């Protein structure tokens, strides 16, 4: 039997504790907040989408891609699903997303807490870890707690208000690991474009394309949300890991037709006023923004527009450009990119190649579902 210490009482730390206890170890969770699983409660807007059935390797990005096939395996996926089933979570599945049947994150938290209590795991809350040392084949926390093995699952820098401020990275670095730069991911994109003042609050089904100057980096289709100084929405989040400098997005508000079919579509509406055509496609605020950009009279019939006006209208309907100055901060990011490189980890066990540490995904250099590592 080993004496196992776990720094961090998030989902990774708690599930690790449960498994370690089942394997006959003495387990202690050290949590800096006054309770465990704080971030879990805000997952999925409080509904807790705890699993996604689409585990295609294409959704995972890392410089060490050769390791991903060892992590994302059918065996591991099945084990995770069986675990949630074993603690009484009945899934409600929507578009591949798994939610508890109650549609409430508290149900998942309560199930995990019950399992912790049943497993005789020692839980110490309001415990602020200041130092981690490795001496004489043991880990020493704050010079007063001693463990044979240590699991660091302290969380990234995303949502620091939950206590996840990235403090664990300093311990990892001190123990000999590399820490690649940690950046926000799954986050909105920032812009100074004044047009956002007009379309703030609008949601539109569209195709959004991210460019570096004029080089296309990636495209997504879905709901794009506009707020003051930001472009948001899930499809936008999925592009955010690629944002550096000199980026722009171009939005196609007519993804329901092929670009080469645009002219035929407009020709069919040749005898309609511009505002009548746009009214069937766009939110009124978007109509106002596009009319403003094109500087055309919305009362004109389409056939009355000049060639230049038609070209401007086409450009703004299928390639509405917004220059991007960066992305949102850590307190708005759902996850982070960066951390411990996968080549410093024994993948099958998640153990450190340097010390007898066990890792959880919060500190490993991998981003999940379109938002992976740098």
Residue ranges and their predicted role:
Residues 21-45:
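Glycine-rich FAD pyrophosphate-binding loop
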Residues 125-138:
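A conserved short coil-to-beta-strand element within the FAD-binding core of flavoproteins
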Residues 5-7, 30, 129, 145-161, ...:
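Short hydrophobic core segments
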Residues 2-29:
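N-terminal Rossmann-like FAD-binding beta1-loop-alpha1 element of flavoenzymes
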Residues 68-76, 95-114, 159-164, 302-309:
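Short beta-strand to alpha-helix junction loop
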Residues 34-36, 41-42, 50-57, 178-181, ...:
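An anion/pyrophosphate-binding glycine-rich loop and adjacent beta-alpha core
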Residues 45-94:
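Glycine-rich active-site loop/strand segments that organize a redox cofactor
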Residues 125, 289-370:
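A glycine-rich dinucleotide-binding beta-alpha-beta segment and adjacent secondary-structure elements
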């Amino acid at each position: 039997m080993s004496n196992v210490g776990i720094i961090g009482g998030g989902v990774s730390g708690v599930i690790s504790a449960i498994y370690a206890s089942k394997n006959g170890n003495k387990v202690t969770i050290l949590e800096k907040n006054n309770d465990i699983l704080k971030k879990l409660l805000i997952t999925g807007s409080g509904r807790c989408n705890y699993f996604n059935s689409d585990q295609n390797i294409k959704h995972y990005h890392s410089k060490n891609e050769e390791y991903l096939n060892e992590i994302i395996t059918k065996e591991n996926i099945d084990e995770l699903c069986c675990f949630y089933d074993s603690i009484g979570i009945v899934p409600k599945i929507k578009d591949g997303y798994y939610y508890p049947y109650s549609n409430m994150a508290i149900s998942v938290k309560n199930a995990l807490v019950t399992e912790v209590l049943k497993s005789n795991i020692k839980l110490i809350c309001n415990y602020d870890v200041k130092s981690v040392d490795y001496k004489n084949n043991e880990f020493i926390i704050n010079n007063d707690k001693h463990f044979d093995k240590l699991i660091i699952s302290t969380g990234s820098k995303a949502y620091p208000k939950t206590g996840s401020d990235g403090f664990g990275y300093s311990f990892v670095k001190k123990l000999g690991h590399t820490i690649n730069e940690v950046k926000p991911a799954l986050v909105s994109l920032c812009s100074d474009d004044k047009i956002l003042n007009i379309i703030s609050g609008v949601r539109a089904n569209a195709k959004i394309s991210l460019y570096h100057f004029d080089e296309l980096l990636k495209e997504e289709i879905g709901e794009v949300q506009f707020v003051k100084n930001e472009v948001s929405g899930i499809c936008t989040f999925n592009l955010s890991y690629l944002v550096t400098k000199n980026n722009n997005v171009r939005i196609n508000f007519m993804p329901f037709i092929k670009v080469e079919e645009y002219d035929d579509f407009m020709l069919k509406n040749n005898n309609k006023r511009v505002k009548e055509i746009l009214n069937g496609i766009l939110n009124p605020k978007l109509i106002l923004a596009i009319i403003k950009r094109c500087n055309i009279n919305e009362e004109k019939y389409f056939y009355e527009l000049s060639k230049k006006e038609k070209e401007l209208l086409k450009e703004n309907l299928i390639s509405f450009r917004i220059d991007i100055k960066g992305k949102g901060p850590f307190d708005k990011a759902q996850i982070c990119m960066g951390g411990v490189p996968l080549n410093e980890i024994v993948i099958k066990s998640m153990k450190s190649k340097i010390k007898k540490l066990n890792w959880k995904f919060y500190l490993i250099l991998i981003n999940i579902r379109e938002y992976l590592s740098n």
